[in-house]
Each structure stands twice: as C-alpha cells, then as structure tokens.
C-alpha cells in the first residue's frame, strides 16, 4: 500500500536566512515518487537517465535564459546530475535547495546591478545588438561577461520605453520601480517555492500534464476547476521575467473580448478607466493574478505583448470588466449566416462550442433534460433546421476540452451509433466508449472547424466526425493532448495525517485513441482542409513538449464509415481553397501576418540603435495602415456586388473561409447525388 507515516513540521530558513526543506516536503517528495512509480501511465524508472532530465529541467526552470548562473556554478552542480534519483528515493532534498540558494545569491547580485545602472545614459547611436533569447548561448564565464549581458538588457528595455514615447526621467522611473519590485518579490521566496519548482522538474520528466501544486496553489487550481473565480477568466504562468496567458476560460471576459490569445504576455495592469498602468515585468505570476482579480463589475486594463512578438515590439491594451465565470458562459451559441456566390444563395448555421460541459447538479434534478453541451447543441440544431439552413458548421476553435462523456454524446447527434473513442489505461486495458444516443439530430452537410488550441474532448469529436466520414474537418492541426489525468491530495496517502496541509498531484493515467486505433496524443487531428497557421507544431502544442507521451496506435474498433465525404469531394474543396488563398484579400492579409510573425519568432537579436529600431517600427506601422485602407476599400466594393452583407461584415478570415468551404461542400454534394 502507498501509505506513509510521519509528523509534519519544520522551519523554512536557518539562522543565516538560507532556505531549507521542511519535514512536510520530505514526506511529500516520497509520496510523489511512489505515486509516479505505481500509477503514472508512462513506465519510467527513476534512474540516472531520468536524474539527468530532472537536473536539466531544474536548472532551466531557474535560469533558462542564462542570465544569472556562471559557468563555474553549473560545473559545481554537475556532481548532482546522476544522483537526484537516489536522493529523491530517500526523501533527500539537499541538492535542490543547495542549487536554489546559489541561484538566490546570483539573482540578488544581478538585481543590485540593474538598480545601480537603471539610470545610466545609454548611447543609442552605436551600432550594437542585443540577443534576448539566450537559450542556445553558453553561461557567462565571468562576472564581467554577465555585466555586459545585463548592460545590454537594460539598454534594450530603456530603448523600448523610449520608442513607446516615455521621457528620459520616466524611463529611469519605470526601470527602477521594475527592479525594486523584482527584488521585493525575490525576498518573498520560501521553501514551498523551491519545493514546487523541484517537484515539477521531476514530474515534467514523466509528461507535461503531470504537475505538483503546493497547498496554496492547490486552492487556486481547485477554484479554476470549479470556474468560481471573479476575474477575467485567464490562466497565467511564469515565463522568465514575464507572466504568460496559457488558457482562456470559455465565456470569460478575456475569451469574449476576442482581443486576447494564448501565449500573450502581461506587461502592465491598470485599474479602472483612468488608473495608472503599472509595469509588471519581473512580477511573480501569482502577484500578477492577484492584481488582475477584483470585484465583479469593475474594470481592469491589461497591457499585452503579443505571443511570439520580440521584447520591445508594439504592445496592445485591452479593457475588461471582471465577472464571475459561470457555467452558462460556456454554453454553445448559434448564428445564421447568408452567403451568395455565382448566383447561388446559401443559409449557413454556425454553432460555436467553447467547452464540453455538464451540470452535474442539474443532471441529478432533471435526468431527461439537464444542462450540458450535447443538450444545448441538440436544441440549437432544432432551431437552425427551423430556419431552413443548408448546412451546419461546428466551431471548436480554442475549445480546450472538458467532459469526455459530452464529446461522445455530442458525436451521437451526427452519427448513427458505434464506438466514438477508445481509452487505454496504465495497465494496458482498453475500453471502448460508444454513442448511446438513439437516432441522429442532424443529417445535412456538416463541417467542423478546429485550430491549434482545440484539444482533448474537441479532438475526440473532430476525429470521430472525420473517421466516420460524416463531415469535413477544416482549420489547423489540433493541440495533440490525448491523455487523461487524475488529481489526488497527497494527504490521502498518509496513514496518520497531521494537521499541516499537503499539496496536490495531477498525474497522467490513460491515453485516448480514435476509432481507427490512432492516438490523438502528440499528433492531434489533422484537418481535411488545412489553413495557414500562426502556430507551428514545433513551437506550440503537445509536439513542442520534450517529455510529451508519443503517438502510437492500437487495434481499430469495428466501425462503418458513412458516405457524406469522399476523396473526390475533398479534392474539389482543396482546389477551391487553394484558389482563394491566392486571390482573397483577407486570406492574403492573413498569410502576410503569419509570415511576419514567423519572421519575428525567428529573430533572436534586436538592434540597440535608436534610428534603426525607429525605422523598423515605422515600417511595420506603415504596412499595417496600408492594409487597413485596402481592407476597407475592398469591403466597400464587395458590399456593392453582394446583396447580403452578413458574410462580408465578418472580420474573422478563418470563419469566412470555413463558411465558403461549407457552401462548396453543399454544391459538391448536390453534384454527387446527380
């Protein structure tokens, strides 16, 4: 049995202020090691090989950009590279705390340097550059070499503020406050922080969805799981000196604004319509979250650096009204779009599904008609058919998943029965999950739109529609999250729990497989018609995670494909799509934006010369303004040619193209039937 005994106590710091592990941490670490050994899906031995991975993860999590440690520090840490497996098994956390305490000294030294030089008068006429991404660089061999890295860091930050319109005194004020706050945050580090970073360096060696949460962070995790927070509905994560948005809650203010995307970085926060914008670069993510949260109905303004943009690039400001994230906000919604082409008129129904949810309380009270994604979509289909739509599109973009049972039952609205998904657990046992719905709710033309942030339950639904050839799947390759997690409180594994609270462990226990036997893990769902994408598989999604569980295949479940889609139809749709990619201005603009973002992401070095940076900034603005004018004039021309303007009024190029493809699909289907 996985049960441990022991009293939980201990001090966080010794008399010199050095951080030390508590007895609770020693107990927790032994429990975590045993849970991963007994229950995790991946059969991985805690050995020298994994020890090296944990070592690299820990160093990277502390100083991934190589701004603090010296090369001599790393050499001194190497003695632990192949020892962490043994120390973890014994509940020994000395190596982690030794490394972290050295890190604290180096960090404090760098912050002292930054504060001493934040008022320097930099020469912006020099032709020198700054490498902001130092992941591939070596560690500095001396303090003088690290000083030069930080001189350029400060110069780049000052230049960015100058280019945004800040006066010299304001630049100094912002930088000074930034690093004073950073130093204040560092002083708040405690042994729980060290332990959480170290345990997640261990869990990340198993897979990216296995995580440890301290008791404090466990409370936040549970609140987010219940969607009970009053705020903007965004999940935040530390990303070096920045706080990154990693998830948007369906129906939350951030999601509904359509101005914020995953991977955006929060660099400033202001309260109310006229509150001062506070610089939050260098803040801890929990402090950023605390600043964003507030009473329902109040306004918060965020200054964001778009995901993929280089430091110093143009930022955007978004105003949001805080609200409580309620179940109703995750409900599917529908609209009817009129589209005309070549003398043919099409009435298209669009159903947006932001989340797969089920209201358990309502289910207990109303077992025949409870609130759920499936029941909502079923009602929307009935309403759309009452409006005589020619086809229906299911929009699953940015739908990160939810209740598995809802993905299965919603598939049943379009499929006549059979297996929807297979699940394989850590013991190798496979369970098939079938659609139990009697009959189908919709038999007409169907397409499903996905993107890189469609994950988990979304991938199950899209994969089933594609495998059964029930509809056409369009958009981008999905995230590739095909695993199942369990969440357990570590206190559950103690024979005699003490009074002190322990954290939570979320760990992977199973994998999803499509009816064909192909896993959705790692590869996700590849659409039948693939759109140009901002997000590359190498940088975003499951395939970008080094420890992600691999794709594999099991035996296919018995199933009979339908005849709604065939290769001839897909060839026609692909041809029409390719033609529009070359002619449609919105799609041309989209491809231009993608190319520019790709160029920005590949850029690891920026100029520290004012004139050159100003020219680059002005060139980007000129191109952006020119495209806005072209787009406005084209919209006016199109409005004169087409009687129904509803499609032309749409700003969403992906949605417009999906509607056009569904119209092509409807036309191709008519020709097939003769």
What spans do the regions from the language model cover?
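Extended, small/polar residue-biased N-terminal targeting/export presequences
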Residues: 46-52, 59-132, 183-238, 299-301, ...
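Cleft-lining beta-strand/loop regions that shape enzyme active-site pockets
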Residues: 11-13, 20-21, 37-47, 184-191, ...
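Bacterial N-terminal signal peptides
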Residues: 1-7
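Extracytoplasmic/secreted envelope proteins and their assembly/folding machinery
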Residues: 26-33, 47-59, 74, 81, ...
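Conserved functional hotspot residues or short segments at active or partner-binding sites
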Residues: 117, 166-177, 514-674
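Acidic/histidine-rich, surface-exposed loop or edge segments in extracytoplasmic proteins
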Residues: 12-17, 29-41, 79-83, 177-181, ...
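Polar, glycine-rich mid-to-C-terminal structural blocks
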Residues: 457, 469, 474-540
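PDZ/PDZ-like domain segments forming the peptide/carboxylate-binding groove
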Residues: 44, 60-61, 82, 96, ...
């Amino acid at each position: 049995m996985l049960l441990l005994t022991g009293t939980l106590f201990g001090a966080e710091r010794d008399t010199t202020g050095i951080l030390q592990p508590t007895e609770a941490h020693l107990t927790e670490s032994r429990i975590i090691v045993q849970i991963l050994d007994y229950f995790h899906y991946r059969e991985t031995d805690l050995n020298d090989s994994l020890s090296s991975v944990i070592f690299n993860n820990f160093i990277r999590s502390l100083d991934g950009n190589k701004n603090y440690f010296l090369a001599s520090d790393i050499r001194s840490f190497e003695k632990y590279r192949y020892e962490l497996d043994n120390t973890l098994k014994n509940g020994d956390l000395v190596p982690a705390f030794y490394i972290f305490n050295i890190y604290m000294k180096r960090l404090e030294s760098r912050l002292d340097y930054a504060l001493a030089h934040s008022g320097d008068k930099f020469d912006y006429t020099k032709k020198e550059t700054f490498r902001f991404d130092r992941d591939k660089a070596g560690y500095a061999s001396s303090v003088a070499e690290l000083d030069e890295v930080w001189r350029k860091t400060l110069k780049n930050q000052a230049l960015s503020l100058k280019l945004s319109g800040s006066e010299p005194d304001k630049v100094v004020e912002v930088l000074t406050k930034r690093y004073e706050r950073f130093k204040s945050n560092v002083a708040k580090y405690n042994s729980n922080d060290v332990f959480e970073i170290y345990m997640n360096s261990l869990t990340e060696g198993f897979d990216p969805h296995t995580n440890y949460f301290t008791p404090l962070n466990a409370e936040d995790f549970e609140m987010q799981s219940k969607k009970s927070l009053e705020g903007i509905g965004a999940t935040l994560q530390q990303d070096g000196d920045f706080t990154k948005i990693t998830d948007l809650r369906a129906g939350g203010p951030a999601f509904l604004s359509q101005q914020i995307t995953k991977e955006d970085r929060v660099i400033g926060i202001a309260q109310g319509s006229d509150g001062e914008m506070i610089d939050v670069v260098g803040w801890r993510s929990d402090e950023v979250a605390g600043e964003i949260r507030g009473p329902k109905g109040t306004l918060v303004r965020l200054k964001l650096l778009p995901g993929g943009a280089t430091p110093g690039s143009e930022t955007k400001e978004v105003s949001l009204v805080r609200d409580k994230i309620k179940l109703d906000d995750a409900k599917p919604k529908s609209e009817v779009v009129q589209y005309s082409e070549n003398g043919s008129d099409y009435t298209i129904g669009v159903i947006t599904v932001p989340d797969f949810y089920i209201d358990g309380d309502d289910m207990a009270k109303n077992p025949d008609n409870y609130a759920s994604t499936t029941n909502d979509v079923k009602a929307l289909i009935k309403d759309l058919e009452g409006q005589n739509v020619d086809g229906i599109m299911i929009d699953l973009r940015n739908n990160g998943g939810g209740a598995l049972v809802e993905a299965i039952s919603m598939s049943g609205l379009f499929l006549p029965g059979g297996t929807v998904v297979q699940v394989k657990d850590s013991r190798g046992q496979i369970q098939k999950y079938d659609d139990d719905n009697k009959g189908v709710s919709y038999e007409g033309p169907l397409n499903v739109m996905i993107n890189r942030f469609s994950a988990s339950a979304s991938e199950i639904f899209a994969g089933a529609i594609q495998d059964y050839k029930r509809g056409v799947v369009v958009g981008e390759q999905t995230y590739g999250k095909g695993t199942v997690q369990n969440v357990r409180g570590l206190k559950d594994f103690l024979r005699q729990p003490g009074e002190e609270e322990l954290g939570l462990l979320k760990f992977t226990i199973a994998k999803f497989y499509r009816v064909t036997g192909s896993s959705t893990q790692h590869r996700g769902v590849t659409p039948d018609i693939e759109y140009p994408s901002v997000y590359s598989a190498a940088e975003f999604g499951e395939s970008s995670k080094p420890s992600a569980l691999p794709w594999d295949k099991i035996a296919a479940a018995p199933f009979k494909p339908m005849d709604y889609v065939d290769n001839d139809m897909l060839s026609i749709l692909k041809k029409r799509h390719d033609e529009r990619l070359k002619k449609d201005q919105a799609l041309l603009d989209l491809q231009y934006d993608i190319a520019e973002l790709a160029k920005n992401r590949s850029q690891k070095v920026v100029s520290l010369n004012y004139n050159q940076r100003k020219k680059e900034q002005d060139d980007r603005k000129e191109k952006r303004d020119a495209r806005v004018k072209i787009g406005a004039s084209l919209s006016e021309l199109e409005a004169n040619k087409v009687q129904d303007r509803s499609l032309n009024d749409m700003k969403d190029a992906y949605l417009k193209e999906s509607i056009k493809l569904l119209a092509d699909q409807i036309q191709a289907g008519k020709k097939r039937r003769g």
